[in-house]
Regions:
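Phosphate/dinucleotide-binding and metal-coordinating scaffold of catalytic cores
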Residues: 1-320, 324-420
Length: 420
């Protein structure tokens, strides 16, 4: 039986700007199928005896540990891996390299995708090496993170790639791979640096768009801000006739310092695709915050308001990957809101609101308010405020984002709860 093992050295940069050796990830490859195990570094365990766990499958003790259930890889490392867009780009890059080197393209495995993300822009604060004395992977000093001024060219490159994967030059493939994020699905995107050295994610128009997705994401993003929800800085720029580019500042960085991010999928021990269909619920997020949150009262209120807001804008893609947590010195906090888009035909959320119902219904949201330690009186007032804010501002914000009256009428059903 053909078998070989890859040893990956794992570091974290969330306790200080200097990386700390976290442990060793072992990848066993048997006939093209990979299995994973991980072992914490003994010194890291000693210095982190009272530290929050990073993954429910990785308890704070010595010895090898393995993913549980149907999971092939630990969620901690899945969050550091590229999304579908990133995988498409890496697969294309491998074909280009194979052609240049006169060989057949390799089939890329999960560990190849994990190590293929650029360290400089990798999501969160987990980092990887194949040699303890070597560079953090992936390293690419020849292709630095593109500046803000390259956005127009990057949008054009993303459009070329969507239209013809085989026609894009390697240098642009490398630039588009830069996001290094497990967030965002297959949407074309790139990471860019602003003039102050801050990382931003640029989400470009896609040939598959039926509406101006970037503009509508900006509308809902600004509505969330007006509702008092925690959202990162954002902006909207039009570079072409194909739609708007939505830019959002990365919340996993504070200057040069990395902030560890974990998806709710990881922290709740879920697998990709977990949804209301299998009983995945907001109540599980509530339980996690109560048990592990550094600021549970604040985060429970924020989470509940997000549920109402998701209903108010019909954000039906609110699955476990689209909720997350960031790790600070005092523990886990609900991350800023991200990936919120209105859906005109939406009538159910991706997650159950209570144990078994995902219906967009204010009564359902009010039903679980006590679990979030919010009184019925306060919940009713907060919900009314969210709905009024959406009702009074969605048209105005849509117009400011360049969306026509017909585009607004098309999207109007997404705001039905607020307009009732």
């Amino acid at each position: 039986m053909a078998s070989n093992q890859k040893t990956i050295y794992v570091y974290e940069s969330f306790r200080s700007t200097e990386p700390n050796f976290l442990g060793t990830l072992f990848v066993e490859n048997v006939r093209g199928r990979e299995s994973y195990s991980f072992e914490y570094d003994a010194d890291w365990l000693k210095s982190s005896a009272n530290y929050m766990y990073l993954d429910p499958d990785l308890q704070l003790y010595a010895g090898r540990q393995y993913p549980t259930g149907a999971k092939n890889v630990f969620g901690l490392f899945a969050d550091s891996s590229p999304d579908r867009w990133g995988r498409l780009l890496m697969t294309r890059r491998e074909r280009i390299l194979a052609e240049q080197e006169g060989r057949k393209p390799r089939k890329l495995l999960d560990s190849d995708f994990l190590l293929g993300v650029y360290d400089e822009t990798r999501m969160g604060a987990i980092r990887f090496k194949l040699d303890k004395d070597g560079p953090f992977l992936s390293d690419d000093s020849k292709t630095p993170t593109p500046p803000w001024t390259s956005l127009r060219t990057l949008e054009e490159a993303s459009r070329q790639f969507e239209n013809d994967e085989s026609g894009l030059e390697q240098k642009w493939i490398n630039q588009l791979i830069k996001p290094g994020s497990s967030l965002g699905g297959a949407r074309p995107k790139a990471t860019v640096l602003d003039t102050k050295g801050n990382l931003w994610i640029a989400k470009f128009p896609s040939k598959h768009d039926d509406v101006n997705v970037g503009a509508w994401e900006k509308v809902t993003h600004d509505l969330a801000r007006l509702c008092g929800l925690d959202v990162p800085e954002s902006m909207l720029i039009d570079f072409s006739k194909y739609g708007s580019t939505f830019l959002v500042r990365r919340f996993d960085r504070n200057g040069a310092a990395r902030i560890h991010f974990a998806s709710a999928m990881t922290m709740l021990g879920k697998t990709d695709g977990a949804s209301a269909a299998d009983g995945s619920s907001y109540l599980e997020l509530v339980s996690f915050i109560k048990a592990n949150g550094a600021a549970p009262k604040r985060d429970l209120t924020e989470l509940w308001k997000r549920i109402v807001f998701n209903m108010a804008v019909s954000n039906t893609d609110d699955h476990m990957r689209n909720h997350g947590f960031i790790l600070k010195a005092d523990g886990w906090h609900l991350s800023p809101l991200y990936d919120v888009n209105p859906v005109p035909e939406g009538d159910e959320l991706s997650l159950c609101v209570n144990e078994d119902d995902a219906t967009i219904s204010l009564d359902l949201a009010l039903e679980i308010a006590p679990y979030c330690e919010i009184s019925t009186k306060d919940a009713t007032a907060m919900a009314a405020d969210v709905l009024k804010t959406v009702r009074d501002n969605w048209n105005r914000l849509a117009a400011e984002c360049g969306l026509s009256r017909s585009a607004q009428e098309y999207m109007r059903p997404a705001f039905s709860l607020a307009l009732e």
